[in-house]
Amino acid sequence: PIDDIQVLCPTKMGMAGTKELNKQLQSALNPPSQNKAELKFFDVIFRTGDKVMQTKNDYDVLWTKNNEKGSGIFNGDIGIIRSVDRFSQNVTIDFEGRVAIYTSEMLRRLEHAYAITIHKSQGSEYDAVIIPITAFTHNLLYRNLLYTGVTRAKKMIIVIGTKELVKTMVDNNRKMLRYSLLRPLLEIEMNRKDTEETDDEKTQSD
């Protein structure tokens, strides 16, 4: 079943990124059929049987699970589209037993989840994981990312790529740097304090 196998990608972009792979995997695993209703939302087609993921926390989504009722579908939650109503443009999605009805407006918070980024997979586990590695993602070829992807698998892991690329990831122990204004601001503040201390020392010596 598609919910037991998860493709994990280092990035969204490129031929082996989530965007392109989701198009290809939807076409291969859940092609158009007269028995499957579908709804087009801008350039994305949501079809009965599609694997989808919530991309933002939404505390107002109502769901039912057996006789239980609740609310809230959260960033990273993965579900299967059970039905599409073309007339009302509502989509019914099963999030591991929690069944929610999405209006067409709510579809902007969904994306296909045949392939997701390794980052999005953190905290989740799957029976089988497939990780495609290409030279396009050379700036993401580091060990921690590979480790995160591999440890999502409970039973089987398949890494697709050349031995050289896999070895590059295993050997590269650096961590991704998060570039922001924090570092330069800290450097400015430290330089300012150093200047003040120097001025104080000069004043005292005078």
Where are these regions (language model features)?
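Conserved helicase/translocase motor-coupling segment
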Residues: P1-K69
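Short, conserved secondary-structure segments in the cores of folded domains
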Residues: F42-I45, K69-G72, I80, I116-T117
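C-terminal accessory regions
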Residues: N75-D206
